[in-house]
């Protein structure tokens, strides 16, 4: 396994318990009116995102990595909509966005090329999520 993929595995392995702890702070462990399906959906989307990044060869164009960020955020927007639009908010942004950016950076994206070093911002604004 490449060092890049080892690092991606490490990021996800460290993030998942933090995310689970976050959900446990809210009603029934689901938070903001979420459901078990919503919690599982967020986890599934993150695992899929990391899998896509790990499958990319070294030197993958930034546009390809950005596409995966956009697809992840679209999926998160769908999960959020399924919970009345109030499931993924500021606290969740503060939790999830750094993980998304760190993984994209490990995959080869230069986050410093984006406003506030946040390549997710353009998609989050468009999708009105996080």
Regions found by a protein language model. Name each.
Residues 1-55, 127-128:
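Short terminal alpha-helical segments
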Residues 24, 57-58, 77, 88, ...:
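Generic alpha-helix signal with a bias toward terminal, lower-confidence helices
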Residues 26, 56, 60, 79, ...:
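Short secondary-structure junctions and interdomain/linker hinges
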Residues 38, 61-65, 85-92:
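Residue-level recognition of alpha-helical structural elements
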Residues 53-80:
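Mature extracytoplasmic domains of secretory-pathway proteins
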Residues 84-130:
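Amphipathic alpha-helical binding modules
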